[in-house]
Amino acid sequence: MSRPVPNPGILDIAPYTPGKSPVPEAGRKVFKLSANETPFGPSPKAMDAYRNAVAHLQDYPEGTSRVLREAIGRAYGLDPDRIICGAGSDEILNLLAHVYLSHGDEAVSTTHSFLVYPIATTANGAENVVAPEVDYTADVDAILQRVTPKTKMVWLANPNNPTGTYLPFDEIKRLHGGLPPHVLLVLDAAYSDYVSRNDYELGIELAATTGNTVLTHTFSKIHGLAALRIGWMFGPAHVVDAVNRIRGPFNVSTPAMLAAAAAIGDTAHVQMSKVHTEKWRNWLTDEVTKLGLKVTPSVTNFILIHFPTTKGKTASEADAFLTKRGLVLRALDNYGLPNALRMTIGTEEANRLVADGLRDFMAQK
């Protein structure tokens, strides 16, 4: 039977699988620690802005997200005209791929990088080239070795999801310096707000001064606006112009726009979340390590826990054990990490329950 046929490569893409969203059961408290969501929710100022926007739902949004672009510009010292807002940074990543990748092109990502990168690459007919990592960390030399005349883009999450590792800014500059000027370097800084390292920078300097670097960011993580789907990009004027030509005219809703503008101004809320995350990330790393499990050093709001392959001690068995206790972590088979679980840093209660649960799991005979 004849029917419409998708473009080549589309059906080869494995659909993105989000973290589990469990249905609470009567009499049992459930902690979702699978999607790197903040346990504190959004800023009260963001919620007030969202509520106030409800009275104007009959009106189309302002098509360029001007209010939000200006708020981002003030927060980071950026030119608002070089900022684009999108329905999550995912939309912007896909728009970049649509603008710059086509059949016969290549884009480089690393072994355990965000799955949207290979999806966006393949969906636009290009080939995803994988550069191996070292200790679950992007390797600049490996990336540069895989750049060919066909390469049009390099994707780099810094810090990386799902490993929680990062590259110092000197390494980012070295990576950029080794790329031909026609290769676009995409720096995804979704988790940057959690980083407290002196050698880390978002990459604003490169995005501001070079013609082939963009920085993307999101309001889904530390700002707690994941449900509103809001992200942004800063980059060269010519990249912004190209992306704006295919961006939907009303791609960011008014409630999302105003909530995000309020959220970015509430620095006290952000700092509170950052301090909590760092404290409990360190605590969890220590507690889990005491159990004989390896934890990849993280600078984000999650940790990557590695399990043995011994029957009775595997990641999948630990996942099932914790789920029965209402503790939902993220299995990572689709990231090529079948022996690991990713855990979002949650409330104190959730963190202690996971530590206790893993202790009981590892003590089983």
Swiss-Prot record:
Choose any GO biological process term that the UniProt entry carries and state it. L-histidine biosynthetic process
Keyword terms of this UniProt record: Amino-acid biosynthesis, Aminotransferase, Histidine biosynthesis, Pyridoxal phosphate, Transferase
Which Pfam families does this one have?
Aminotran_1_2
Q: Mind telling me what this protein is named?
A: Histidinol-phosphate aminotransferase
User: What's its EC?
Assistant: 2.6.1.9
Q: Which family does it belong to?
A: Belongs to the class-II pyridoxal-phosphate-dependent aminotransferase family. Histidinol-phosphate aminotransferase subfamily.
Q: Which HAMAP family does the UniProt record give?
A: HisC_aminotrans_2
Top-level EC class as recorded in UniProt: transferase
Give yes or no: UniProt keyword ATP-binding.
no
Can you provide one Gene Ontology molecular function annotated for this UniProt record?
pyridoxal phosphate binding
PANTHER family in the record: HISTIDINOL-PHOSPHATE AMINOTRANSFERASE (PTHR43643:SF3), HISTIDINOL-PHOSPHATE AMINOTRANSFERASE 2 (PTHR43643)
Assembly notes: Homodimer.
CDD domains linked to this entry: AAT_like (cd00609)
Query: Where on the chain is N6-(pyridoxal phosphate)lysine found, per UniProt?
Result: 221
**What pathway, per the record?**
Amino-acid biosynthesis; L-histidine biosynthesis; L-histidine from 5-phospho-alpha-D-ribose 1-diphosphate: step 7/9
This protein's record includes keyword Transferase: yes
